[in-house]
Structure formats: C-alpha cells, structure tokens
Design a protein with these regions (language model features):
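Alpha-helical transmembrane segments of polytopic membrane proteins
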Residues: 63-64, 103, 127-135, 183-198, ...
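Aromatic-anchored segments of alpha-helical transmembrane domains
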Residues: 74-79, 161-174, 232-237
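Hydrophobic alpha-helical transmembrane segments
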Residues: 121, 125-143
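Transmembrane-helix motifs of polytopic, lipid-linked glycan transferases
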Residues: 135-153, 167-170
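Internal/C-terminal transmembrane anchor helices
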Residues: 218-244
C-alpha cells in the first residue's frame, strides 16, 4: 500500500510538472498573431528562387535588352560614324533594269550576285535607312550565332562578335571599301553571314527537336552579353574615328560638295589632325567657292600621309579628287575626261555620270547632256537630280542662278591650249602656267603658285595684282617676304607688304634654326606657333623630295612639282 501511494504521488507530481511546462510554453494571444504573420511572410518568401539582386532580369527581358541595345549601337555606328561612307558607296555604283547598261557588271564573275546586292545597296542612299537595314541584319546574325553555339543566357550578345568582325573588315579596307571596288559588298557580306548563322541555328533547332531535350528551368540572369556587345561596337566606333578619320572625311566631303555645304567642309578640314591630299583638295574647293582661298589656304597641315589604296589604273589617290578639282577650276574638258576614264576603267558610277552631265551642260552639248541625264534617271531615287538640271538644259538662264555652276563659269580659261601643255594634275598645272585670265582666275593662279612654291611665277602674278590695285592677303605678304631673302628688291616692288611681316619671317627662321637638320622635328616643334603662315608651309610642309621641283624648271606636260 505504501509503495502504491508513493507511485501515485510521483505520477501526480509528474503530471503537474508537464502541465506547468505546457502552460509556460503557451504563447500570449498577441505573440501568437505576430508569430503567425512572421510564419506567413516566411512561407511567402520561400516561393522566391533567389533574393532580389541588382542587374538580374528574367531571360526574356534580358534577351530583348541585349539585342535591342546591340541594334541601337550598330545603328548609331552606321549613322553617325560611317554614315557618309555608306552614302558615298551608294553613289559609287550604278544600277538599272536596262541590261545594256549593266553588261559591265553582269559579265564579271559573280556579276548576277553583285547585281542583286546593288538593289539592296540603294537603301544606303540615306544613311539612317541603310544603317537601320545593316543593324537589323547584324542583330539577327548575332541572335542566330548565340542560338547555334548554345551561348549561356548571361552571355547572349557575344554573337555581336560576328558583326563587329564585319565592321572591322570595313575599317581595314578604308577607302578601298567602295573606291574602284564593288561597293555592294557592304551589304552582301552581312547578308551572307546572316544566312550562314541562320542555317547553323536551324540545324541546331532540328537536332534539339529530334532529341526532345528539355530545357532547364529559366532563372534570372545578368545580361553580361549586352555589355560585351556595347563594348565591342563602341570600341569599333572609337577606332574608326581615330584611325579612319581621313577615310570618313574623304567620303563626307564629296557628299557635302554635292549639297554645296562649303562651310562645313572648311570647318571640318581645319579640325583634321593630318589631312590627306583628297581632304586638302576638297578644302581648297570649298575655300575657292566661298572666295576665301588666299585667306585660309594654309590653315591646315600639308604633311600628307601615304594612303594604302589598291592599284588599278595608276591614278589611285588623285582619282579621288582630280575630277572635281578640274571642274571647279573651270576646266570642263579635263573634268569630263577624268570622269570618263573612271567609268571606262572601273565600270559605270553614278557620280561620274553626274559630273559628265554637268560638263556637257556647261559646254552647251545638249544632246550629250540628255544622254547622261537619261542614264542617271534609270537609277532609282535620282530623279530629283535629273529634274533639276533638265530644267537648266531647257532654260540656260537658270544656270546663272545656280551658285556653283555660275562660279565655275567665271573660271573658264581664256587661252586655247591642249591639256598636255600643262603640268599634271591639270587644275594645278593650268593655274601655274596660264598666261591670261580673269581677275578671279588670277587669284586661283596665285594660290596655285604659292602651293607649288614657284616663287618666280607667283611674283609675276603679284605684280599684276599690284597694278590692278587688288589687296594682298597675309599669305601673299609673307610669301613676298620669304622671296625677299634671296631677292631683296621684292620688298621695294610691293609696298603692300606690312612693315612687320619681314620681322615675322626672321622670327620664324630663329625658331627653326635648332631643327634645321631634322625635317620632322622642324615640323612638329614649329607647328603650334607657326601653322597658318606661309613660312611654315614653305619650309616644313609638302617638301618630300619626291614632291618638289625647282622654280619654273618643269617642262610642259611633266608631272613634276609640288602636288
């Protein structure tokens, strides 16, 4: 009995202890609500795959962002960086539905392929439209490449390496991209690359469908591929602006000249770091068209870099500008011949047809002009040009209202000589060697003599200007002071020379003395202070041994001289 009572007491004590513990562990009513809310929040958070982090996107959104940014980057490149290049390339071809006008192209290997791609190339007549097309093609290429090679979601956009490689090829070709080569390769190569990547992507999709493989669950990703695409395209753009500055200007200036935007040509040429001959030539044309030739002619450096041009007919670098320079010098027949030579040697080009049409118009050859206008009108989107100059053909008085054509008329030669009587190129040799001309021609002739460093011929023209009471720009005064170093009587013959100009020449010679044995050091160390003066040009620039000649020693028809 005693044992039973003891057991019952122990059991009762244990029961009370457990109940006390349960009572102590029971939550307060308010505490219970708070804990329940926390549990619900924890349960809700448990459905999230990962904590929210900066830069993570859903795969679909990341894909659109990546390829959208890539598209915009490529579009910006072909609009704002290489827009003038693709526009000039479009003008450097010819396309029509008339088989007889396309025989030159169709008879070549792959001619029919080039014929088809030239129709697509017409989109590049307007840089934004051509840029949009190229950006679309290149973006689709990048998408197909990423899919075909199973690029991870976070790196999608690395496929823009293919378009960037195409753009790098364009940069490496420079002016050769369209000059005397097939310009439609600009659109043909991207289209071929798209077709190749699309075929690979289709094969991968077919294999994937046959194997019935299931894709893993889509997780949020960081679109590193978008950053890579922007860096690649941006790096290409910076390279183009730095390395291919002259390539861009060589394409841009003829486009601006067609619109008669001379002031833009002048301002951009003066900003160029090291202009080529082509850039300097269009700069001179713009100065001449705005009556500023002798005032600003030497404001740019004339240390011409060597161009890497494909060799075809021997007129590689000069073929870029000699046609337009002859035209704007009033030499219509040499300009016409240069355009014709380009067509014969390199096939039909619409820009050459346009120049020949204008030469025929100004020469009064109406039938010939109509022939070229008809050829131009067969090419799509050129009707505005044809309509404008057809009106002048029917009413010659309209020519006088055109600033460019009336300016060219004012420079017509007044002496009858064959082109072979002058040094080449014609526009330079004619102005150095002419014996008579108008007052406007006298100015261009004086400028040509200064450029050629032919001081004897220059002094003859300066004497005529003195007799006519014409003002002497600063460069002419400096040139006379330079000539006076060997011919002191020159200063006495020209009272127009300011009294401080000879002092400026002597100051230049003092600065030049330490570098007289090193032509490159002479040029670089004196450039900051003296660029823009004739002394700097005469002693430091355009003085490569292969480019110089002694005053008045070149024989007629030779190619000697500074050019």
């Amino acid at each position: 009995m005693a044992l039973r009572a003891c057991t019952e007491n122990e059991s009762t004590h244990t029961h009370h202890t457990v109940n006390k513990q349960r009572k102590n562990s029971a939550p307060h009513p308010l505490q219970g609500k708070k804990t329940g809310a926390a549990s619900a929040q924890a349960a809700k958070g448990g459905h999230q795959s990962a904590p929210r982090r900066f830069g993570r996107m859903k795969p679909v959104k990341a894909k659109w962002v990546t390829y959208g940014l890539g598209f915009l980057a490529v579009f910006a490149f072909f609009t704002f960086v290489y827009g003038d290049v693709i526009e000039r390339a479009e003008q450097s071809m010819y396309i029509s539905t008339a088989p007889e006008t396309m025989q030159y192209l169709l008879s070549q290997p792959h001619g029919h392929l080039f014929y088809a791609s030239r129709w697509v190339m017409l989109l590049c007549k307007w840089a934004p439209l051509g840029a949009a097309f190229l950006a679309l093609v290149m973006t689709l290429t990048a998408r197909a490449f990423d899919y075909a090679f199973r690029i991870p979601r976070s790196l999608r956009g690395i496929g823009f390496a293919v378009p960037v490689a195409e753009m790098a090829w364009m940069l490496s070709r420079g002016t050769n991209l369209y000059y005397k080569n097939e310009p439609s390769l600009i659109v043909l190569i991207p289209l071929v690359a798209l077709a190749a990547c699309a075929v690979l992507a289709a094969l991968v999709a077919l294999v994937k469908r046959c194997t019935k493989s299931t894709a893993p669950a889509a997780l949020a990703v960081r679109p590193w591929g978008a950053l890579l695409a922007l860096l690649m395209v941006g790096g290409t753009a910076v390279t183009a602006l730095k390395v291919n500055e002259n390539v861009i200007l060589t394409a841009r200036f003829p486009n601006l000249a067609d619109r008669q935007d001379w002031e833009t040509i002048i301002s951009e040429a003066q900003k160029a770091k090291r202009p080529t001959r082509a850039v300097a030539a269009y700069y001179a044309i713009a100065l001449e068209e705005t009556d500023q030739l002798l005032n600003h002619m030497f404001d740019i450096p004339y240390d011409f870099p060597k161009l890497q041009l494909d060799h075809f007919d021997g007129s590689e670098e000069y073929g870029l500008f000699v046609m337009d320079c002859n035209f704007h010098a009033g030499l219509l027949n040499p300009a016409y011949r240069a355009a014709m030579d380009h067509v014969v040697m390199n096939g039909p080009r619409v820009f050459a047809y346009k120049r020949m049409a204008l030469c025929a118009l100004l020469n009064g050859e109406k039938a010939l002009c109509r022939k070229y206008l008809d050829l131009i009108d067969r090419m799509p989107f050129e009707h505005d040009f044809v309509e404008r100059y057809s009106a002048m053909l029917d009413n010659p008085k309209l020519i006088d209202s055109d600033a460019e054509l009336s300016h060219v008329r004012s420079l017509y030669p007044k002496e009858s000589k064959f082109e072979q009587n002058y040094q080449q190129p014609s526009f330079l040799g004619y102005n150095v060697g002419l014996a008579q001309g108008s007052d406007r021609t006298l100015l261009t002739s004086a400028a040509a003599c200064l450029y050629s460093k032919d001081m004897n011929a220059f002094l003859v023209r300066a004497q005529i200007m003195h007799q006519k009471g014409m003002p002497f720009p600063t460069c002419m005064q400096e040139a006379i002071a330079v000539a006076a170093l060997k011919m002191p009587q020159a200063l006495e013959a020209f009272p127009e020379v300011g009294k401080f100009v000879p002092d400026e020449v002597r100051a230049f010679l003092i600065d030049a003395k330490p570098y007289v044995e090193d032509r490159e050091a002479l040029r670089q160390n004196l450039k900051e202070r003296w660029l823009g003066t004739y002394m700097y040009y005469y002693y430091t620039e355009n003085n490569d041994p292969s480019q110089t000649r002694k005053d008045s020693e070149a024989t007629p028809g030779s190619k000697a001289g500074v050019n």
